[in-house]
UniProtKB/Swiss-Prot annotation:
It comes from Agrobacterium fabrum (strain C58 / ATCC 33970). Homodimer. Keywords: Aminoacyl-tRNA synthetase, ATP-binding, Cytoplasm, Ligase, Nucleotide-binding, Protein biosynthesis. One of its GO terms (biological process) is histidyl-tRNA aminoacylation. GO terms for molecular function: ATP binding; histidine-tRNA ligase activity. It holds the Pfam family HGTP_anticodon. Its EC number is 6.1.1.21. The gene is hisS. It is found in: Cytoplasm. SUPFAM superfamilies: Class II aaRS ABD-related (SSF52954), Class II aaRS and biotin synthetases (SSF55681). This is Histidine--tRNA ligase.
């Protein structure tokens, strides 16, 4: 008895963990937001560039290319010349490589913006993805803090261009140099204490997560979490901890500025950092940005390990409900700062740089919560239905379609099984088509087309119960000569747009 041939096993369709498919609505909303951001950047004189998704792993900075497989945090592969390449994890490291490689050709200051996907080889979770979009702007080759002040002003203008009202956002500014001065003042200056300074930076980076008491433990002996795991602390004494917490706990910079200046007095970096903060404050104030929009705030601690001078963060201050049903402040949607060391890694000479990055997906969530994004959906295409399948008729339907497109009207000729006309109208309904164009043999003989207003037809069918009222209402289907097709379609679309405007205004 012959063995039955085994059926080939179907390949299971599955999305990789930490990645998402994006719908048309999501893409349209992203494009709408990115276009608004781009317009602000270009008003400031920034121009676009684009770098590849892949870079040599050593160019990304954080990761060692000589490990067996450099996949800690990045997705990597080995090229045919045995060199490791990795998907970019941000847009800044590729910019640094680009600037260094083209340094003799580019014009400094080099002001650019970039939007694109970045990749993180990390454990995915709720709201934590392995691929997401960032939108960056950077100035390379400008050492003065006026470049940092301009970045803060551009961030503020970007928030407002996106429809976020004053009072619903704030750009918060700190300076890494001031913290360096604080650490020097408490006895952690010099190369011998580099490791302890790094531990302090990592401890205060947890301020939002653990609060002052949690950070106090991490600055001191250490902290045990709820699971019982123990994180060794930086080993500072009580007086040292008090001074660090004073600095990161400042809420009113103007009221605490004198005390901060005294704390870092005699430390070159600390005094320089305070001067830079004061200068940024004066520059933005002189340009008309008050402290409700751009605020000097030493509690900004994210990225202090990475940045070399001013650090800034765009925070949305309105409340949202989290997954636990609790009211929380929405929080950060972007940030940046001065990173004078990144380009210099390739150059052997100092190259100042400053910039910021917007988390596109997170900001898009905020804008949807505010009703500022995705409210105006792109108009679905006019559907040209197919009544007859002969070549002559098909050519005529295609001509109608092209005539509409030539006048800037989205149009689509039905490509499914044309013999079931009811399915064509169902398709138009699912698509959200505003109008259907119909021409059978009788209409073709007369040189006319039927234009069906699908939106008006749907409204009438829901509101009118008897045939008499239907006939007296605005006509939902009209017959016009072929030559008047485009003009009549445009007229109906304008009526529909006016109805939408009236509805939005409550009229």
């Amino acid at each position: 008895m012959s063995e039955k041939a085994k059926k080939p096993q179907k390949l299971k369709a599955r999305l990789p963990r930490g990645f998402v498919d994006r719908s048309a609505a999501d893409i349209h909303a992203t494009n709408e937001m990115v276009d608004k951001i781009r317009r602000v950047y270009e008003l400031y004189g920034f121009d676009p560039i684009e770098t590849p998704l892949f870079e040599y792993t050593d160019a990304l900075g954080k990761f060692l290319p000589d490990s067996d497989r450099p996949n800690e945090g990045v997705f990597s592969l080995q090229d045919d010349d045995d060199q490791w390449m990795s998907l970019r994890y941000d847009l800044t490291a590729p910019l640094a490589r680009h600037v260094a490689e083209n340094f003799n050709e580019i014009q400094l200051p080099y002001r650019t913006y970039r939007a694109g996907y970045v990749f993180r080889n990390e454990k995915p979770g709720p709201g934590r993805f392995r691929q997401f979009m960032q939108f960056d702007a950077d100035t390379v080759g400008a050492a003065g803090v006026q470049a940092d002040a301009e970045m803060c002003m551009m961030m503020a203008d970007t928030m407002e261009a996106l429809g976020i009202a004053r009072g619903d956002y704030v750009i918060r500014v700190n300076n890494r140099k001031v913290l360096d001065g604080v650490m020097e003042a408490i006895g952690l200056g010099g190369e011998d204490n580099a490791g302890r300074r790094l531990n302090v930076l990592r401890a205060i980076d947890k301020l939002d997560k653990f609060g002052p008491e949690g950070v106090k433990l991490l600055l001191g002996p250490g902290r045990k979490d709820e699971s019982g795991d123990f994180t060794k602390g930086a080993g500072l004494g009580d007086e040292q901890i008090e001074k660090v917490l004073f600095f990161v706990g400042i809420k009113d910079y103007a009221a605490s500025a004198d005390d901060l200046a005294k704390l870092v007095a005699g430390t070159s970096k600390g005094e320089e950092g305070v001067d830079e903060l004061n200068t940024i404050g004066a520059l933005v104030s002189g340009a008309g940005y008050d402290a409700t929009r751009i605020k000097i705030d030493p509690s900004v601690v994210r990225g202090l390990e990475y940045y070399t001078g001013p650090v800034y963060e765009a925070e949305l201050t309105f409340d949202v409900t989290n997954e636990k049903g609790e009211k929380v402040v929405f929080g950060s949607v972007g940030g940046g700062g001065r990173y004078d060391g990144l380009v210099s890694r390739f150059m052997g000479q100092p190259v100042p740089a400053t910039g910021f990055s917007i988390g596109v997906s997170r900001l898009m969530t905020a804008l949807k919560n505010l009703g500022k994004l995705g409210q105006v959906k792109p108009l679905a295409p006019v559907l040209i239905t197919v009544m007859d399948g002969d070549v002559e008729s098909m050519g005529r339907y295609q001509r109608f379609t092209q005539a509409l497109r030539a006048e800037g009207i989205r149009a689509e000729m039905y490509q499914g099984n044309w013999k079931k006309f009811g399915n064509q109208l169902k398709y138009a309904d699912r698509l959200g088509s505003p109008i259907a164009i119909i021409q059978g043999g009788d209409e073709r003989a007369e040189g006319v087309v039927q234009i069906k207003d699908l939106i008006e037809g749907k409204r009438l069918s829901g509101e009118i119960e008897d045939n008499a009222s239907w006939r007296e209402a605005r006509v939902a289907q009209v017959s016009v000569p072929e030559a008047e097709l485009v003009a009549k379609v445009r007229e109906i679309l304008e009526h529909q747009a006016e109805d939408v405007r009236r509805a939005a205004e409550g009229r």
